[in-house]
A protein has these predicted regions:
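Acidic, His- and aromatic-enriched active-site or binding-groove loops in soluble protein domains
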Residues: 242-258, 309-330, 340-342
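Active-site and substrate-binding clefts of carbohydrate-active enzymes
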Residues: 2-210, 333-581, 588-592, 636-638, ...
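C-terminal (or distal) subdomains of carbohydrate-active enzymes
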Residues: 307-312, 335, 504, 508-515, ...
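Conserved short loop/turn motifs at secondary-structure junctions
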Residues: 230-233, 263-265, 293-303, 384-390, ...
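Metal-dependent polysaccharide deacetylase catalytic core of the NodB/CE4 family, i.e.
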Residues: 220-300, 345-351
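Loop/turn elements at helix/coil->beta-strand transitions in domains of secreted/extracellular proteins
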Residues: 63-64, 220-223, 251-255, 289-293, ...
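Acidic-and-aromatic substrate-binding clefts and catalytic sites of carbohydrate-active enzymes
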Residues: 207-211, 231-239, 296-304, 324-330, ...
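CE4/NodB-like, metal-dependent polysaccharide N-deacetylase domain
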Residues: 44, 50, 58-63, 272-314, ...
Length: 987
């Protein structure tokens, strides 16, 4: 006699009662046991639909039933219960290691009780019936999650199921297919009865290396939509295997994630470098895959608060706001969001609802996840993620269900998904404070590489500004043509070296505008610029920090002659007076930034200089160095301008000024006054002249390991000597020497040099430590730091990351370019100059982690007070003067001239490229404007040449809006934190 019922003994009353925290092995066994009951031979013999019951005597008081007991229920099946089942002519069987083994065991047991109908189709159709059982389980969870009761016509469904099993037994393929499809259709109708909206399923495949031939064949043979995430630009080389590339080109169901190196995540990286990297990666996609990616996603963290602006500018239409390494991105209440950046830029994104398709346990409650999407989300979306070739068997069940019915959702390509859900739905503004703190490796080589990385990108931006400016002057003064298009321009000799391995891509600048030039001159962004981007990306990788510092240092050395050639070119383009003394000593200075730059020039081999508004000399002091007369001078170089400082032999009356080092332990000028503790050498306080109250203090310290329940403690500074290195009305410099001590234990030795010059609002601090006794292992609880404290606990602490000012949270922050403490009357600033790890403690303390290599370290940073242009100051204050000595005649225009300036002063302007066709004079130039203060404004860009037309553009050169030109000034409306690209054409 055969069984009349097929029952799964659950550890709870129903599937919705099962804990989502169930152990993975128990969850896998439970799902495998349920679907194994749906084997067509079992259904055909029992002539019934499988069901579930609670594992207790009252629920399992059933006759002539096969009771399958999964691992989760075996402890509940007491001996008395098993004996009761035997009395009722029922039989309990425990699950096996996997689904097929469990089904085989039940079939074998069935054969001992009742001979079954032999059929060669049992095994061929078993997977389809398993998928039907999987769908039945998930539908129940969906309905219960939506708080409904099932209205499924069980009698009709059972009849259709039995017809399907009967057809399989008779080996009638057509009938089996027809009746099985009817079962799926009836389940889909039941689902639509409660919720008819479509559910979107997205298969995300992660790849950590290029797929080999077998893996590529398996992946590309799939017929459903897939989205691959990997470092594709790095995997493509001239000798790379083209099998997987060809497979992707032929398979229209596979889309690749745009991205590559996570360069854009470096918070202090200038936006131009990030945009250049994004554009270069897209060109690689176009060349090798035949289409540019529309969706941006990388495996490593690569998104930040301003990513929508950069991605839209680079041609991307959407992104995945997902971090596959850890849940560090901000999570939205909706799966599909319209992500708004601080500057108002918006991009479509998916922010959560990821299912690990490699874990069977993820599918036990899949229906509950789908039900929540239907209940709470405007666009029901599920991302099923797995490494290539590592999906679990329920994923195959889901694929079979989706091929037959949209019951559990439909697979969709990501570009189609975003195109069909373009309406904003849920718009969410994600500020920088909501984004996670980045990984904080504290390896000394990584920290030291940060310093070089900062200086390289800063100096490279300055040199590019100079190179574009030089091309503009060539075209304006001498009608010189632009160089031929090349992707390799060696700075030292201007030799054009075409690279045949690089794709020749021309960016179109306009739509139907006949006045728009053909393209920006790509030689304005030579190989040196591209090399900087690659080195910066390499140095971001923790395991490459040591090796990356070497190419970064080489690039830094290449920038020096590049800058000198630009300065010499600018000097030679300036008209000089023929009647002035050519033998007179002069210094030619260039300012590559869009705001005026105040510079200290020490020990110039000049007799004296004239202090006046016309000469741009703010202060000077003549003295002797050995047998030679020298002068210390403070000058103001005009914005993106030039200045010629000339030797003055005649006697000049100067206003007597007080010394900068006016008394022991004090440096002061007209803007800031710093007091130092003579016993330790620490910065005791900074003051605004004629204002009471200490604004800021600081000290060098070693954070000591915590002991017991008490808080962390710090070492103390013990000065062993003090030297007044320099003191005159222009500059003052004090050196403290001493030991870092913890009680009677010496932890290291230090030298701290404080310096301040006339007219400066920044106190320079240079620290050199030796003999440090710190653990070799990385430790965020025991480190060397500069410890900053401020007096006002109500001060608002902010930092700049990715060009955006945001409130600094408590804890670690990574790579801020600038930190601000905003009080009611004053603003204090910490200028890190490459110090990348900062930890805010309590309400008024800050630890800035200092890099150590081989038990010693050297670093230079600054403290500012009431900076008028804080963002530019953190760039230009630590850069070396762009200057050359010359003996040519005076310039006809006077000692100074400017070329580009902008108001208001907090707007930063960069020169991106010259516009025009190779071999012709430049027709215009492309500039970038950035607001770093978080204030909407209309920027007025004043130019050295009369503009004819100006337009804002995207990264591909497509014109967005035409701009107003008034009095030779281009008016550019900017929203808070916005970065705008502008093309300017000359008359």
């Amino acid at each position: 006699m055969t069984w009349k019922r097929l029952i799964l003994a659950l550890p709870g009353g129903a599937p919705e009662d099962l804990s989502e925290a169930m152990a993975a092995d128990l969850a896998e066994d439970l799902l495998a046991s349920w679907t194994a009951l749906w084997h067509p031979e079992l259904i055909h013999q029992a002539q019934t639909i499988p069901e579930w019951k609670r594992s207790d005597p009252s629920a399992l008081d059933v006759e002539q039933a096969l009771v399958l007991v999964p691992k989760a229920s075996q402890s509940l099946m007491e001996t008395t219960l098993r004996e009761r089942l035997t009395v009722l002519e029922s039989e309990a069987i425990e699950s096996r290691s996997d689904r097929l083994s469990t089904a085989s065991a039940m079939r074998a047991l069935l054969a001992t009780r009742s001979p079954s109908t032999p059929s060669a189709c049992w095994d061929r159709w078993q997977d389809e019936f398993f998928a039907l059982g999987f769908a039945y389980w998930q539908l129940h969870l969906i309905i219960r999650q939506l708080r409904y009761s099932s209205t499924l016509n069980s009698v009709l469904f059972q009849e259709q199921l039995l017809h399907a099993a009967q057809a399989v037994a008779k080996e009638d393929e057509a009938e089996a297919e027809r009746w099985l499809q009817s079962c799926f259709d009836q389940l889909a109708q039941e689902r639509d009865h409660h919720f008819a909206q479509a559910v979107h399923l997205i298969d995300v495949v992660l790849l950590h290396r290029p797929p080999d031939d077998s893996q590529s064949k398996h992946l590309t043979s799939a017929t459903h939509a897939q989205f691959w995430i990997g470092d594709f630009p790095q995997w493509i080389s001239p000798d790379s295997s083209g099998n997987w590339l060809e497979s992707i080109r032929e398979n229209g169901q596979i889309d690749l994630a745009g991205g590559g190196d996570p360069l854009a995540v470096i918070p202090w990286l200038e936006e131009s470098f990030a945009l250049e990297q994004l554009a270069e990666n897209r060109q690689i996609y176009c060349q090798h895959f035949g289409r540019a990616p529309e969706v941006y996603a990388t495996f490593a963290p690569s998104l930040h608060a301003n990513s929508p602006r950069q991605l839209l500018a680079s041609g991307y239409k959407s992104t995945l706001l997902l971090d596959w390494q850890a849940a560090r991105y901000p999570q939205s209440s909706q799966a599909k969001i319209y992500w708004e950046a601080p500057d108002g830029s918006c991009i479509d994104a998916i922010s959560n609802q990821v299912i690990d398709a490699a874990q069977v346990a993820s599918f036990l409650h899949l229906g509950t996840r789908i039900g929540k999407q239907m209940d709470y989300h405007q666009v029901p979306t599920l991302l099923l993620t797995h490494w290539a070739g590592q999906s679990s068997w329920p994923m195959e069940d889901l694929l079979r269900v989706a091929r037959r019915s949209p019951l559990l959702g439909s697979w969709i390509r990501l570009p189609e998904y975003f195109a069909s859900t373009q309406r904003p739905y849920h718009q969410e503004r994600l500020t920088a404070s909501k984004f996670p703190k980045q990984p904080l490796p504290v390896d000394g080589s990584q920290l030291a590489a940060d310093d070089v990385r900062w200086s390289v990108q800063r100096d490279m931006t300055a040199v590019r500004n100079l190179s574009v400016l030089l091309q503009q002057l060539d075209g304006w003064l001498g009608r010189q043509p632009l160089p031929q298009v090349s992707y390799d321009w060696h700075w030292s000799d201007d030799t054009l070296k075409p690279d045949p391995t690089r794709p020749q891509v021309t960016a179109e600048l306009g739509s139907n505008d006949q006045e728009t030039p053909a393209s920006p001159s790509t030689s304005c962004q030579p190989a040196l610029f591209l090399k900087v981007g690659r080195c910066l990306a390499l140095s971001w990788q923790e395991d490459a920090a040591i090796t990356a510092r070497q190419p970064l240092s080489r690039v830094a050395r290449e920038i020096v002659p590049a800058a000198r050639r630009c300065i010499e070119g600018l000097r030679d383009r300036m008209p000089h007076s023929s009647d002035s003394l050519a033998s007179k000593k002069r210094l030619f200075l260039v300012n590559p930034w869009s705001g005026p730059r105040r510079l200290l020039l020490e020990n110039l081999p000049l007799q004296a200089v004239e202090e006046s508004e016309s000469t741009r000399v703010y202060a000077s002091h003549s003295h002797s160095q050995g047998d030679q007369a020298v002068v210390d001078v403070v000058v103001d170089v005009p914005p993106m301008g030039i200045l010629q400082v000339s030797d003055e032999t005649r006697v000049i009356k100067k206003k007597k000024l007080p010394l900068i080092a006016r008394e022991p332990g004090v440096l002061g000028n007209e803007f800031i006054e710093a007091h130092f503790d003579l016993a330790s050498g620490r910065l005791k306080g900074t003051y605004a002249p004629n204002h009471r109250g200490n604004r800021l203090s600081g000290m060098l310290a070693v954070r000591l390991p915590e002991h017991g329940s008490g808080g962390a403690s710090y070492s103390q500074m013990k000065a062993t000597g003090m030297k007044l290195l320099k003191s005159n009305p222009v500059v003052g410099r004090i050196l403290f020497q001493g030991d870092l001590v913890d009680g009677s234990t010496t932890l290291g030795h230090y030298e701290i040099e404080y310096s301040l010059f006339r007219g400066s609002r920044v106190l320079d601090i240079a620290v050199h430590c030796t003999g440090l006794q710190l653990p070799a292992a990385n430790d965020l609880k025991h480190y060397l730091c500069w410890r900053t404290a401020w007096a006002n606990i109500s001060g608002i602490v902010s930092l700049w990351q990715h060009g955006t000012k945001t409130t600094m949270p408590t804890g670690w922050s990574y790579c801020p370019s600038l930190l601000e403490i905003d009080e009611a009357d004053h603003r204090e600033y910490l200028l890190p100059n490459g110090l990348s790890r900062h930890r805010r403690l309590d309400d008024r303390f800050l630890d800035s982690l200092l890099p150590i290599v081989n038990q010693e370290g050297a670093f230079w940073f600054g403290i500012g007070l009431d900076l008028p242009r804080p963002r530019q100051t953190c760039l230009d204050h630590f850069a070396k003067p762009f200057s050359i000595e010359e003996s040519s005649s005076e310039m006809q225009t006077g000692p100074s001239a400017w070329f580009v300036q902008c108001t208001p002063s907090h707007i930063l302007v960069e020169l991106v490229a010259s516009l025009g066709r190779p071999g012709e004079p430049p027709q215009g130039m492309r500039i970038r404007l950035q607001d770093h203060a978080g204030r909407s404004t209309v920027a007025a860009v004043d130019l050295f040449r009369k503009p004819r037309k100006a337009s804002t553009i995207d990264i591909a050169g497509k014109i967005w809006t035409d701009l107003v030109i008034e009095d030779q000034k281009v008016k550019v409306p900017l929203k808070a934190h916005e970065s705008a690209m502008v093309d300017i054409l000359w008359e």
